[in-house]
């Protein structure tokens, strides 16, 4: 399984990637939407772990873009926000969690 982690907090990004690699997954890491976009032009991913707030874009908008090109890609949002409206918006955009 190939996973893309898109999280701008470097420590959290590194921790997620380390744990996923240790569990046997192939993982690519992006700190920004633009870097993640470049990965997506070269590689298909089984799972994308996506931050809602990125320095160069909105995770919800990016999710919409990804789902338009690759509707079968599983997306899990990662955020410190605990607002139910954010959770519902993610589900409406096709995120799994």
Outline where the language-model segments fall:
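N-terminal/domain-start alpha-helical segments
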Residues: 1-97
């Amino acid at each position: 399984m190939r996973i893309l982690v898109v999280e701008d907090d470097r420590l959290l990004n590194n921790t997620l990637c380390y744990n996923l690699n240790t569990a046997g997954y192939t993982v690519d890491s992006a700190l920004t939407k633009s870097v993640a976009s470049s990965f997506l032009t070269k590689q298909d991913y089984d799972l994308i772990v996506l931050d809602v707030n990125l320095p160069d874009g909105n995770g919800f908008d990016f999710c919409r873009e990804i789902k338009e090109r690759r509707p079968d890609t599983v997306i899990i949002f990662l955020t410190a926000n605990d607002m139910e409206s954010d959770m519902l918006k993610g589900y409406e955009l096709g995120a799994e969690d």
